[in-house]
């Protein structure tokens, strides 16, 4: 009996030691998790430390997660980690090391090599990111080719080539302006398609010659240009015009009067020069490519005071003033676009600024006349724009010294005059298409 009691005591002691060892092991392997709106990278770092496994995190993996779990055993830590990632829209991609990414843009090799990745049920679509696969990628059949452009600038073709390459599988396009060419890297299929595309757009553009007459005339008298559209025999025909009637036709600034055929511009220049009530402001000519802006400007670069600091006001020893220079004169900016069937679309921006003789307490005063419009005409036609009225009023006093102050009769030696003059600016513009060789 005594021996049997000793056996029971030994068995109980061994069982107690086993239970204590099991509890210690469970406590060692179990680990509580408490993450409240923590960065997902912190959760990945926790998993890597507990599992002693390396994990690659895609740079696009961002966001926060919340996890409350009483304990996580070492045996099920992988399943727990994967479940938390899937619940928050991420995936664990198998490999050595494994990788955490988003499944929106998985590598194309996934369909052919399903064994290299986790089960497809683990992928939850979310976000816009590029996963980093730990598995070695198959090298692409990349080639580099130089596309020489002969009729257009490479910088103009660069954005079009990039769009074409990106829409056909992707690649790199670099501009080489020194040789007017494009360096492209991509697959052989892209190169063949891009060669045909560049050939179709490497076409010389037409050029447009813009001839213009900017003139001003008296609003009352005007200038007769009716002969400009006359026949070869000198008779006047329909289509001529007289600017004395434009006051009502062009009631708003920048209004369009009409479009004329024939050599209107050359004859109009001579007519304006011969008219005493008219004045030629400028006759600019611009040659530019279709789709490119041509600009010409003639005038003065006038300083304008923009700020002033004096010694008394600012308590400084060196008073100074700031000056900004601005162009004052005549300018013409035209952007022509050659359409089909000899049609032209012109974006016109013209200015005629001038300095006045008046002065204010702060600075000088400038007169500004500005027109901006977009029109469509045919090759060789002449466009008339106008309606910019400049009004000047002049007061004059004249007198004979000493005698003007004589009482009673002093008014006989004094005179006063008022004059009011209104002048209107017109723009005649002719466009000729010069075909590319």
From Swiss-Prot:
Comp. bias intervals (Polar residues): 99-111
Chain segments annotated as transmembrane: 328-348
Protein name (record): Virion export protein
Subcellular location(s) per record: Host membrane
Single GO biological process annotation from the record: viral extrusion
This protein's encoding gene: IV
Highest taxon, organism lineage: Viruses
Keyword terms, alphabetized: Host membrane, Membrane, Signal, Transmembrane, Transmembrane helix, Viral extrusion, Viral release from host cell
Pfam families: Secretin, Secretin_N, type_II_gspD_N0
Family according to the record: Belongs to the inovirus G4P protein family.
Membrane-topology descriptor: Single-pass type I membrane protein
Ranges where the record places region Disordered: 99-120
Lineage summary: Viruses, Monodnaviria, Loebvirae, Hofneiviricota, Faserviricetes
Subunit structure: Homomultimer. The channel is composed of 14 G4P subunits that confer a barrel-like structure. Interacts with G1P; this interaction results in a complex that spans the inner an outer host membranes.
Range of residues in the leader sequence: 1-30
